């Protein structure tokens, strides 16, 4: 009986050792940030876009976000963020024309860490493939999405 138990332990150990892989867990630091549109009245109160975006960039750099989503961001704000964050790029289109006009729900990602496998945008409406308002919305609502692959590990995330 003792010999059978010993053989069983050796067999199980051998199987477990054979199953060992080089899998390394991937840590992913993500965030979502409502940047708030560049509203002129905010500047009068001291928290305009010109005051906010350097602080936002510092927060992103401090936390070393791999990927972060944005809301309420116009094209010029995206350009400011990209300039303030070398090593990041973004995906996403404007909600008004599917190109550059209107607010974006862009996704920033670290270009040294990720490749884009696939990306897209859709509108929250009855016609999700074209810029449009849905149901009871006052303005068009857009969703941007991306499928990324980690350059080092091959890990994929959407």
Language-model features: where?
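Sec-dependent N-terminal signal peptides
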Residues: 5-14
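N-terminal secretory signal peptides that target proteins for export/translocation
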Residues: 1-2
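N-terminal, active-site-proximal structural segment of metallo-dependent hydrolase catalytic domains
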Residues: 7, 18-85, 95-103
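Structured beta-strand-rich core segments of catalytic domains in phosphoester-bond hydrolases
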Residues: 67-158
